[in-house]
Amino acid sequence: MATPPKRRAVEATAEKVLRYEAFISDVLQRDLQKVLDHRDKVYEQLAKYLQLRNVIERLQEANHSELYMQVDLGCNFFVDTVVPDTSRIYVALGYGFFLELTLAEALKFIDRKSSLLTELSDNLTKDSMNIKAHIHMLLEGLRELQGLQNFPETQH
């Protein structure tokens, strides 16, 4: 016995709805989470560089040749130490490389690195907004496909 045309149309619509929902949850939401996680890591790096800039500026203001401080050896185990010369600092460049720089050179490096990280975070924010727009567009398409009415959006 043949399936009535209306029933086939309903089944085809239901199949399309399932495919769109799967695409939203399996692809778009996963991509959005990856972009947001990457942006959070960039923000963490940026915060570390800004903290380093504050330390360097304090060192320049203090103008001492020797520095007494505590160093974390890991697991919150601190030891007292003396830094005999504060005119130079080792800065992590990335990928396990460190470079000895003067305080002025380190500030220039931090400014450049901060601007690059800010630009990267802005691009990641734009990417996340694009993905959110695609999700919203697909949800609107699903709403129309299912014949649902417009519901007022709740304010967050």
From Swiss-Prot:
Pfam families xref list: Prefoldin (PF02996)
Signal peptide annotation: none
Predominant cellular place of this UniProt entry's protein: cytoplasm
Superkingdom of the source species: Eukaryota
GO biological process: negative regulation of transcription by RNA polymerase II
Gene Ontology annotations for the cellular component aspect, listed alphabetically: centrosome; chromatin; cytoplasm; cytosol; mediator complex; nucleus; spindle pole
A GO MF label: chromatin binding
Keywords associated with the record: Activator, Chaperone, Cytoplasm, Cytoskeleton, Nucleus, Repressor, Transcription, Transcription regulation
Transferase listed as a keyword: no
Subcellular localization, as worded in the UniProt entry: Cytoplasm; Nucleus; Cytoplasm, Cytoskeleton, Microtubule organizing center, Centrosome; Cytoplasm, Cytoskeleton, Spindle pole
Keyword check for Transferase: no
Oligomeric form and interacting partners: Homohexamer. Component of the PAQosome complex which is responsible for the biogenesis of several protein complexes and which consists of R2TP complex members RUVBL1, RUVBL2, RPAP3 and PIH1D1, URI complex members PFDN2, PFDN6, PDRG1, UXT and URI1 as well as ASDURF, POLR2E and DNAAF10/WDR92. Interacts with LRPPRC. Interacts with androgen receptor AR (via N-terminus). Interacts with estrogen receptor ESR1; the interaction relocalizes ESR1 to the cytoplasm.
Function: Involved in gene transcription regulation. Acts in concert with the corepressor URI1 to regulate androgen receptor AR-mediated transcription. Together with URI1, associates with chromatin to the NKX3-1 promoter region. Negatively regulates the transcriptional activity of the estrogen receptor ESR1 by inducing its translocation into the cytoplasm. May act as nuclear chaperone that facilitates the formation of the NF-kappa-B enhanceosome and thus positively regulates NF-kappa-B transcription activity.
Family: Belongs to the UXT family.
Protein name: Protein UXT
Record lineage: Eukaryota, Metazoa, Chordata, Craniata, Vertebrata
